[in-house]
């Protein structure tokens, strides 16, 4: 806890999934790079990925009760008011104990209690704490829509996400904060080390495949089903299939390796080893893949509100990738579309350049500066 009020205290609220946590931690890193005396505390719940990711990055984590928002009318909806009150009460305790100067929210069920505890309203505090909201997705969720109504600044990855500050027609468009280890990645310089790390050949095309932290069955089946075609074309594969999944890859004697792993802990090396990627199009995935200039075949999740396809559209429109529907992804598609791409160095180079041009490498620093400006303005008025 921060007892020294000569130092700046920042709360980042973005727990639950990696898509909420990683932007929060990227901004935390950028804040510390600008002001190493600042104290950054993360909010989270006991059931989110933040229990692992936040301590690994060296930040204190304060746990609050989760407030999942039911998508359909169920008994959980009746329990919601009580859960909100309990979570806001605990969040208020954290804000008081840390002497928070600003709250930065990234959406999800951790951000909502932070917005309610910091801002005005029935659950308002004696000391109002300014809020900065960042929306990573192309279509904003309910937490950020609520937070935007009371925020000092509202930021977003893309235009038209459905959130904006009072008096503005849209949010301030800055892109998605991405960790410095990715934005500063020199893929060419790390290529040899990366390929050796995964047991991939030093030369020849490499296809990277991943479906998020849990993998994706449709990606697994389509790409592994094309293993013989890939090997015949001289394409090596690095495939993260998910820790709960298995992958049945046919043997291809004499061909380049098909390296299957449950999870990739070194995404910097994975990106550096690859020439192209097949992946989902969550906001954070699109941000990282475009930031490193990697040509991509995006396969949006087939359910939800269609936001994954929206996330990928700007990069695809810039020429840095393509979108294929989950139901259209097959071993035949990999053989007929992906392999020719991997065998065309000129097209790969052009797509990589266009992908990098669509990325926002400085987003984390820009968001951090806004957060510090908002906090400084508030501290100056106390």
UniProtKB/Swiss-Prot annotation:
It is found in: Cell membrane. UDP-N-acetyl-alpha-D-glucosamine binds at residues 17-19, 137, 179, 213, 308. It is a peripheral membrane protein. Its EC number is 2.4.1.227. It catalyses: di-trans,octa-cis-undecaprenyl diphospho-N-acetyl-alpha-D-muramoyl-L-alanyl-D-glutamyl-meso-2,6-diaminopimeloyl-D-alanyl-D-alanine + UDP-N-acetyl-alpha-D-glucosamine = di-trans,octa-cis-undecaprenyl diphospho-[N-acetyl-alpha-D-glucosaminyl-(1->4)]-N-acetyl-alpha-D-muramoyl-L-alanyl-D-glutamyl-meso-2,6-diaminopimeloyl-D-alanyl-D-alanine + UDP + H(+). Cell wall formation. Catalyzes the transfer of a GlcNAc subunit on undecaprenyl-pyrophosphoryl-MurNAc-pentapeptide (lipid intermediate I) to form undecaprenyl-pyrophosphoryl-MurNAc-(pentapeptide)GlcNAc (lipid intermediate II). SUPFAM superfamilies: UDP-Glycosyltransferase/glycogen phosphorylase. It comes from the Bacteria. Pathway: Cell wall biogenesis; peptidoglycan biosynthesis. It is an enzyme of class 2 (transferase). Belongs to the glycosyltransferase 28 family. MurG subfamily. It holds the Pfam family Glyco_transf_28. This is UDP-N-acetylglucosamine--N-acetylmuramyl-(pentapeptide) pyrophosphoryl-undecaprenol N-acetylglucosamine transferase. The gene is murG. Keywords: Cell cycle, Cell division, Cell membrane, Cell shape, Cell wall biogenesis/degradation, Glycosyltransferase, Membrane, Peptidoglycan synthesis, Transferase. GO terms for biological process: carbohydrate metabolic process; cell division; cell wall organization; lipid glycosylation; peptidoglycan biosynthetic process; regulation of cell shape. GO terms for cellular component: plasma membrane. GO terms for molecular function: UDP-N-acetyl-D-glucosamine:N-acetylmuramoyl-L-alanyl-D-glutamyl-meso-2,6-diaminopimelyl-D-alanyl-D-alanine-diphosphoundecaprenol 4-beta-N-acetylglucosaminlytransferase activity; undecaprenyldiphospho-muramoylpentapeptide beta-N-acetylglucosaminyltransferase activity.
């Amino acid at each position: 806890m921060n007892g020294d009020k000569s130092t700046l205290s920042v709360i980042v609220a973005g727990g639950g999934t990696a898509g909420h946590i990683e932007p929060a931690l990227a901004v935390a890193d950028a804040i510390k790079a600008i002001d190493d005396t600042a104290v950054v505390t993360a909010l989270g719940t006991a059931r989110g990925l933040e229990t692992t990711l936040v301590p690994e990055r060296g930040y204190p984590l304060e746990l609050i009760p989760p407030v999942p928002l039911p998508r359909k009318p169920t008994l959980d909806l009746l329990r919601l008011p009580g859960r909100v009150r309990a979570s806001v009460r605990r969040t208020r305790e954290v804000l008081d104990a840390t002497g928070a100067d600003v709250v930065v929210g990234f959406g999800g069920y951790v951000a909502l209690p932070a917005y309610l505890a910091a801002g005005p309203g029935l659950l308002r505090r004696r000391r109002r704490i300014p809020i900065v909201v960042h929306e990573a997705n192309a279509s904003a969720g309910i937490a950020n829509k609520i937070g935007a109504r009371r925020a000092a600044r509202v930021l977003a990855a893309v235009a038209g996400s459905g959130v904006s500050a009072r008096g503005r027609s849209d949010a301030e468009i800055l892109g998605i904060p991405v960790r410095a280890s990715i934005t500063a990645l020199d893929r060419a310089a790390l290529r040899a080390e990366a390929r050796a790390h995964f047991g991939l050949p030093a030369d020849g095309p490499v296809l990277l495949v991943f479906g998020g932290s849990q993998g994706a069955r449709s990606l697994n089946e389509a790409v592994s089903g094309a293993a013989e075609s890939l090997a015949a074309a001289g394409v090596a594969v690095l495939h993260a299939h998910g820790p709960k999944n298995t992958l049945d890859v046919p043997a291809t004697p004499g061909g380049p390796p098909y390296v299957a792993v449950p999870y990739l802990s070194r995404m910097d090396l994975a990106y550096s080893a690859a020439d192209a990627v097949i992946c989902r199009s969550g906001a954070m995935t699109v941000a990282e893949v475009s930031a490193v200039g990697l040509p991509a075949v995006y396969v949006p999740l087939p359910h939800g509100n269609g936001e994954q396809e929206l996330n990928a559209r700007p990069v695809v429109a810039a020429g840095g990738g393509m979108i294929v529907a989950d139901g259209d992804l097959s071993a035949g598609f990999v053989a007929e579309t992906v392999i020719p791409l991997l065998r065309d160095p000129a097209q790969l180079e052009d797509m990589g350049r266009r992908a990098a041009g669509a990325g926002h490498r400085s987003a984390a620093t820009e968001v951090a500066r806004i957060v510090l400006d908002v906090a400084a303005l508030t501290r100056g008025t106390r």
